[in-house]
Amino acid sequence: MTLNERIAELRERVRQQRPLIHHITNFVVMNDTANVTLHIGGLPVMAHDRAEVAEMVTAAGALVLNVGTLSPDWIEAMLIAGRRANELGIPIVLDPVGAGATSLRTASNRRLLEELQIAVVRGNSGEIGALAGMGGVVKGVETVVEVDDPTAAAKALAQQYRTVVAVTGRQDVVTDGKRVFLVDNGHEWLKTLTGTGCSATTVIAAFAAVEREYPFAAAAALACFGLAAELAAPAARGPASFKVAFYDAIYHLSADQIRAGARVTAVAG
């Protein structure tokens, strides 16, 4: 089976199994990430109260922790849900939104990485560079200075916390500290919408819920996400029409389209 055939098969598994994805995520993207979860084939739940997260996560296939609109109560809820997910072997996908922009964000993300076993960290170059201690400058939640070598930063962070790191950008990099996947799918229109990185994190979680080879799951998810953007682009007249076409493309993404269009390369570590 070729790599693209494996990606297509994994995408169909998500559709068939319909994993519940528990999100503790930010206010900006809740609606969008819930819809993307549905369109890729999963079931979303947005539950962040400390009183219920440990119970809610028991039914989940994966847990998304997104610190975009963080607060002390939400960080505590993330830790409660994360500890329970670790007990049950449920994968956690961390989106370290704005790491490096403020000391609170950087410290909160490091606390989550230190106290929980995270399956996948998905961030932009600046966020991953900041957490790895290798530079990168984040203004708000956007990278304004990229790290010189995103692959090296991703490997360093993956090795430090025994996790998988996915750096999204012009070329996506996924690594567990040894193996590396490069993903070349995507489109410039993605930059015109807020929350596309958070939505990519959601797709990674849906794939990780049904595939425990997390480096491959993350790379496959990013390939499908980027390919959907490519397929949507010809219908776009602006950001709003692109968003509608993009959601439709995620929903309709077929095995034939993936086999023909996914651009993922496995490289030596």
From Swiss-Prot:
GO terms for biological process: thiamine biosynthetic process; thiamine diphosphate biosynthetic process. It comes from the Bacteria. InterPro entries: Hyethyz_kinase, Ribokinase-like. It is an enzyme of class 2 (transferase). SUPFAM superfamilies: Ribokinase-like. GO terms for molecular function: ATP binding; hydroxyethylthiazole kinase activity; magnesium ion binding. Pathway: Cofactor biosynthesis; thiamine diphosphate biosynthesis; 4-methyl-5-(2-phosphoethyl)-thiazole from 5-(2-hydroxyethyl)-4-methylthiazole: step 1/1. Its EC number is 2.7.1.50. The keyword Cell membrane does not apply. ATP binds at residues 122, 168. Keywords: ATP-binding, Kinase, Magnesium, Metal-binding, Nucleotide-binding, Thiamine biosynthesis, Transferase. It catalyses: 5-(2-hydroxyethyl)-4-methylthiazole + ATP = 4-methyl-5-(2-phosphooxyethyl)-thiazole + ADP + H(+). Substrate binds at residues 46, 195. Its cofactor is Mg(2+). Catalyzes the phosphorylation of the hydroxyl group of 4-methyl-5-beta-hydroxyethylthiazole (THZ). Belongs to the Thz kinase family. This is Hydroxyethylthiazole kinase.
